[in-house]
């Protein structure tokens, strides 16, 4: 169980600033909204009630990690100090909490909803919310609001709402998406232009928001597993690995070495699968049609391996609490061992037709630069963070599975541009092959599934687990009250920090560069919208 320190709201901002400056807690790993219910006279004195937030922080300097929480009992006007001036990603994280719980973050510059319609009534993640009564099915188009609210604290302690315009009347604003192919899903960017130069981007999320975190509260633990595959569908195995690992950690379950080997190999096959699709999609975005076919051709070999063992190609449904759904197919080892030399032998062709292409290089080199400091402040993990010089690989920071038993290099570049983000992923394909090669002939015997009770109840407490997904750190925060269903199950989306940073990355770039920048950030919209 994770120990979480409580801080009263009045002292929150000063304490967070102290942790950032003195303890070097520069990485806001996760920010989770909570509804601990209404206070009752029967409650024990230590029972936490009210609406609040759980923060997970980490120092990229010392590696120290800490979790904090705060709460307010006023449900009519819950107010908590904003930390968006300390960590840039808090801007989007706090908007998400406001959207779900109605908590107003004092000092936040843009207190709009993040996922739901602007005319949505109520806050759906509150335990006492009834959305069907307040929100009948609406078939009308949503009105676009250009007004934001900045919540300020007056010297006398009162709150002041200051309305601000997103765009000026003279600004030329273009919509990129939500139906534009280069947005890689239903994501809408409202782009302010001066000629061809980008001056500002307003990212609009939520077009395929499905309320997965709300659904989890009415599902048993085994039932929640299926929904993780529907988040980042190019990292389905890794997502479910994180959730299973979190539940197993909470229940004190130690899976067999065979399961650890299988999960690690599957995670790395998934990483290669995702990076090959990244290569193809980026090539198509930049007009390199031949390169597009290379990635899809070779990705099929991995999907065939998945289908044979898991029964699915994209959505595998393979990991389960205590192990995996079925043992490896008899052909699994043979087919994986055939794929390794094949991929190694052909990767040079990928570089010949695209990496070394002068047009591709001119579209990516020096374009969309993200500094290391901004990567950390926005929480841009994965290939994006490592391309900016931040060694943030969860497999190295907090080893899980059998990553502590294999030799592999964490790929880090320092340029922070589109080309560096591209090269990180291409190099990671080779490192994933190296990891798989060390494991494939050494899979130990043993059970592929631990015996579980028919009804799974997780001990009361708070738990966090994370894996290195194809796009970065995918985290799971679980709060249990000892029931067969989670009290709160929150996912740290890998893609939300990437979209949060896109305004900073693109300012001053040309509109055509937005395509290359979005392609190399490699976000997946269902992972963001959840």
From Swiss-Prot:
Its EC number is 7.1.1.-. The keyword Translocase applies. One of its GO terms (cellular component) is plasma membrane. It is a peripheral membrane protein. The keyword Transport applies. GO terms for molecular function: NAD binding; NADH dehydrogenase (ubiquinone) activity; NADH:ubiquinone reductase (non-electrogenic) activity; quinone binding. Residues 1-144 are annotated as: NADH dehydrogenase I subunit C. NDH-1 is composed of 13 different subunits. Subunits NuoB, CD, E, F, and G constitute the peripheral sector of the complex. HAMAP family: NDH1_NuoCD_2, NDH1_NuoD. This is NADH-quinone oxidoreductase subunit C/D. The lineage of its organism: Bacteria, Pseudomonadati, Bacteroidota, Bacteroidia, Bacteroidales. The gene is nuoC.
């Amino acid at each position: 169980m994770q120990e979480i320190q409580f801080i009263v709201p009045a002292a929150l901002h000063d304490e967070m600033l102290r942790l950032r400056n003195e303890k070097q807690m520069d990485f806001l790993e996760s920010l989770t909204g909570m509804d601990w219910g209404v206070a009752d006279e029967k409650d024990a004195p230590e029972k936490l009630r009210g609406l609040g937030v759980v923060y997970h922080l980490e120092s990229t300097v010392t590696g120290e990690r800490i979790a904090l929480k705060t709460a307010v009992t006023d449900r009519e006007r819950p107010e908590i100090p904003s930390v968006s001036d300390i960590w840039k990603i808090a801007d989007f994280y706090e908007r998400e909490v406001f959207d779900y719980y109605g908590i107003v973050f004092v000092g936040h510059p843009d207190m709009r909803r993040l996922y739901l319609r602007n005319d949505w009534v109520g806050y759906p993640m509150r335990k006492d919310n009834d959305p069907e009564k307040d929100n009948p099915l609406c078939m009308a188009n949503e009105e676009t609001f250009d007004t934001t609210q900045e919540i300020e604290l007056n010297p006398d302690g009162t709150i002041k709402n200051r309305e601000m315009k997103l765009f000026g009347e003279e600004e030329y604003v273009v919509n990129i998406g939500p139906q534009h192919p280069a947005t890689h899903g239903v994501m809408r960017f409202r782009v302010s232009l001066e000629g061809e130069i980008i001056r500002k981007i307003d990212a609009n999320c939520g077009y395929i928001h499905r309320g997965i975190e709300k659904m989890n509260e009415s599902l048993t633990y085994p039932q929640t597993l299926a929904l993780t595959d529907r988040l980042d569908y190019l990292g389905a195995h890794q997502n479910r690995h994180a959730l299973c690992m979190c539940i197993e950690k909470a229940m004190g379950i130690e899976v067999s070495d065979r399961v650890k080997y299988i999960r690690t190999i599957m995670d790395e096959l998934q990483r290669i699968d995702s990076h090959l699709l990244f290569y193809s999609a980026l090539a198509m975005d930049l007009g390199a049609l031949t390169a597009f076919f290379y990635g899809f051709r070779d990705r099929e070999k991995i999907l065939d391996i998945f289908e044979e063992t898991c029964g699915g190609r994209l959505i595998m449904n393979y990991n389960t609490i205590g192990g995996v759904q079925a043992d490896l197919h008899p052909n699994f080892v043979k087919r994986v061992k055939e794929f390794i030399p094949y991929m190694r032998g052909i990767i040079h062709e990928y570089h010949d037709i695209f990496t070394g292409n002068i047009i591709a290089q001119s579209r990516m080199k020096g374009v969309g630069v993200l500094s290391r400091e901004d990567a950390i402040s926005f929480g841009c993990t994965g290939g994006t963070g490592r391309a900016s010089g931040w060694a943030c690989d969860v497999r190295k920071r907090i080893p899980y599975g059998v990553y502590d038993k294999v030799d592999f290099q964490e790929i880090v570049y320092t340029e922070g541009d589109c080309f560096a983000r591209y090269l990180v992923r291409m190099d990671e394909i080779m490192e994933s092959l190296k990891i798989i090669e060390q494991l494939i002939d050494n899979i130990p015997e043993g059970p592929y599934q631990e015996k579980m009770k028919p009804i799974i109840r997780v001990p009361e407490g708070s738990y966090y687990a994370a894996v290195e997904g194809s796009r970065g750190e995918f985290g799971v925060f679980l709060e249990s009250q000892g029931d067969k269903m989670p009290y709160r199950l929150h996912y740290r989306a890998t893609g939300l920090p990437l979209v949060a940073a896109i305004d900073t990355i693109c300012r001053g770039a040309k509109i055509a560069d937005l395509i290359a920048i979005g392609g190399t950030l490699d976000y997946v919209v269902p992972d963001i919208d959840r």
